[in-house]
């Protein structure tokens, strides 16, 4: 009960009175392949080049520098996602992630005679084809606060072009990583912690409701030289959404994932993402990497998603 009250208070103090439900959906589309293959767990996984998005505090662990290019098709190709992730720096790491979301060939219709009612002689016809485009840029910075405690921040900017409307958005996420011991880690990400704004050119604006991500992971080797990463994650929102667990405006969904590395250049991944199963594989050769993830269709029949990426580390 005390934990529930603490979570509610933490979210409430960051929510403005004008917050808009679903305004932050574009920021919820994750980059990367490996974390997606693990059921969308990634707040404690440092092996991904998109780690700065999942939890910017991971950058304080000095991960390898590199670049990743990803292509994803959501809902059996209805929405495309293109992404570039970059981690640079020597002693101090910085991440940059560029995410592009697109829904193309959206057909707009109107009646042949707009002044008359719908009938067999006055049918809808396609008069225009449009597309929806989102361009989102994330940065990530981190520092070590104590021996086992790390803090990170991820500012973000976005440009939205939806049909004949366009707008801009800006905000930031706040991440934390606590190394409980040599094997267990706790990751926290307070997304949109200072009221991310979406400003439309027509004069309207939306405020993104903050949400809280919590993840607990455990790393071990059941067999010598075969590392295993286990993680469970919870998304906690105050938007009165339908979710796995609901109580008033508070809702929570859950994720779980596993990564097994039988040999140094092969990683096998699987997970559970709310109501879907995920799986994937990561293959590396010297500094080159190739990753693939699959997410099966949900109960809403929105179709499956596939991701593939190539990477280079130095």
Model-found features: residue ranges?
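Positively charged n-region of N-terminal signal peptides that target proteins for export
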Residues: 1-5, 147
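Sec-dependent N-terminal signal peptides
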Residues: 4-14
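Subset of outer-membrane beta-barrel
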Residues: 19-314
């Amino acid at each position: 009960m005390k934990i529930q009250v603490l979570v509610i208070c933490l979210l409430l103090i960051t929510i403005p009175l004008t917050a808009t439900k679903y305004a932050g959906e574009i920021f919820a589309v994750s980059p990367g392949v490996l974390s997606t293959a693990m059921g969308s767990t990634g707040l404690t996984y440092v092996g991904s080049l998109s780690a700065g998005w999942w939890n910017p505090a991971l950058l304080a662990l000095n991960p390898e520098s590199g670049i990743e290019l990803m292509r994803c098709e959501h809902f059996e190709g209805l929405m495309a996602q293109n992404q570039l992730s970059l981690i640079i720096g020597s002693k101090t790491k910085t991440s940059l992630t560029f995410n592009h979301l697109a829904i193309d060939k959206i057909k707009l219709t109107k009646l042949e005679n707009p002044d008359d009612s719908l009938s067999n002689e006055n049918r809808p016809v396609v008069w225009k084809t449009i597309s929806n485009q989102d361009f989102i840029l994330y940065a990530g910075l981190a520092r070590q606060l104590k021996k086992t405690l790390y803090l990170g921040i991820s500012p973000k900017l976005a440009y939205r072009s939806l049909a004949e409307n366009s707008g801009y958005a800006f905000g930031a996420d706040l991440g934390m990583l606590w190394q409980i011991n040599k094997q267990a880690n706790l990751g926290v990400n307070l997304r949109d912690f200072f009221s991310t704004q979406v400003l439309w050119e027509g004069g309207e604006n939306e405020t993104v409701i903050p949400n809280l991500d919590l993840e607990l992971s455990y790393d071990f080797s059941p067999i010598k030289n075969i590392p295993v990463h286990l993680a469970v994650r919870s998304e906690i929102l105050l938007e009165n959404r339908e979710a796995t667990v609901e109580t008033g405006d508070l809702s929570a969904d859950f994720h779980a994932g596993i990564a097994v590395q039988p040999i140094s250049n092969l990683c096998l991944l699987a997970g559970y993402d709310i109501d879907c199963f995920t799986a994937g594989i990561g293959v590396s050769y010297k500094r080159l990497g190739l990753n693939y993830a699959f997410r099966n269709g949900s109960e809403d029949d929105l179709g499956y998603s596939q991701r593939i990426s190539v990477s280079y580390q130095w």
